[in-house]
C-alpha cells in the first residue's frame, strides 16, 4: 500500500474510533493501538471485516490500566486471571441460551495491563497481546453460538470449539468439552506476529498523524533481522513452525477462521495426515501444552516420558505433511531446520529429570538462540 493510501486509511479509522474512545474514556495511547490493530486486520482480511471490527470495538470494552491483568481483573470483580499474561479476554457463557436460542452472549471485556507480573511490558508486547485477544474475538464474530438441543450449546472461536452441556447438579450449572484449543492458540500467535510486523513496517512510510507516527517509533525488536517475534513460541509452536510457514495453510486458516468454514481446515489437515484424524491431532497438541507444565512442576518421569512420546508423534506427522505439501527436498530441509529445534529441546528435557538445573537452562538458552538463527535463515531464503 502506497503512502497516500496508508495515510488515508489510518486517518479514516482513527477518526472513526475516536467516538468509541470517548465512549469508553480510552487514553490516546489505547486509541492509537486500536486504530493500528483495525488497519492491520483491514489490510489482512479486506473490507469484509470492516463492520465486524467496528461492532467489536464498539461493544467489547478494553480495560487498560496500571498493573498486571490479575490485579486489574480483581479490581473490576472479574475474578483471578492467569499469571504471566499481558492481556486476557473475560468471557461468561450465557446459559439462558439453553431456554431461548435468540439470547445473545454477555458482553466480553479485554483486560490489558501495563505489566507482566512485576515487570513493565514493552509497547510492542502490549500491542501484540491486544491484537491477539482482539483476533480471538473477531474470529468468533460469525461463529458465536449454536443451540444444538435443549441440553447442548456449541460455541466456536477460530479453531477453538467448545460444547457446553446443561448440568443442573453442577455448581456452574454446566459442564464443557473443548477441541482445537492449542491449535487455535498456535495459529493465533503466529498470525498476530504477522500483523504486528505489518504495523512495524509502517515506519517505512511518512505517517502524517504525529501521534501515530511517534507511537510506531516506540515499537522495537531485539531480533537481528528486525522482525518482531511473538512471545508464544513454546514447544507446540516450534513443532508446528514448518506448517505455519506454509502460505496455503496460513491463508486458509486466516480466511476460514473468520468466515466460519472450519471444515475446509479440517479437510486440509486430514488430507495431508494419513495416520491420524483432525481431532486426534488437536488432542495431541492439547496434551503437549498440558504436560509441558506438569513435568517441570511435578518432577514425574511418567509425565516426561509421555511428553516426549507425544512430541515425537507430532514431529512425525509434521514430517509427513511436509513431504506432501512441499514436495521439494530443499524446502523440506529448510523447514526441518526449524523442526530440529524441538528434537533438541525434548532430548535435553532429561537434564531436568537428573536435577542438572544449570545445564538444563543453558540448553534452553542455546535452543532459543538456535531457533532465532534458523528463523533468520528461513526469512533470508524466501
Model features per residue range: what roles?
Residues 135-143, 191-201, 244-245:
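Hydrophobic/aromatic-lined pockets within catalytic cores
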Residues 165-238:
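Metalloprotease/metallohydrolase-associated module, dominated by Zn2+-dependent proteases
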Residues 51-55, 146-159, 202-217:
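Short, glycine/acidic-rich hinge or "gate" loops at secondary-structure transitions
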Residues 5-6, 209-382:
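Pan-zinc metallopeptidase signature
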Residues 66-147, 158:
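Active-site scaffold of zinc-dependent metalloenzymes
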Residues 12-65, 71-73, 77-89, 134:
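Zn2+-dependent metallopeptidase catalytic core
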Residues 124, 140-186:
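Post-HEXXH active-site segment of zinc metalloproteases
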Residues 30-33, 37, 117-126, 175-187, ...:
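Conserved aromatic-histidine-acidic binding/catalytic patches
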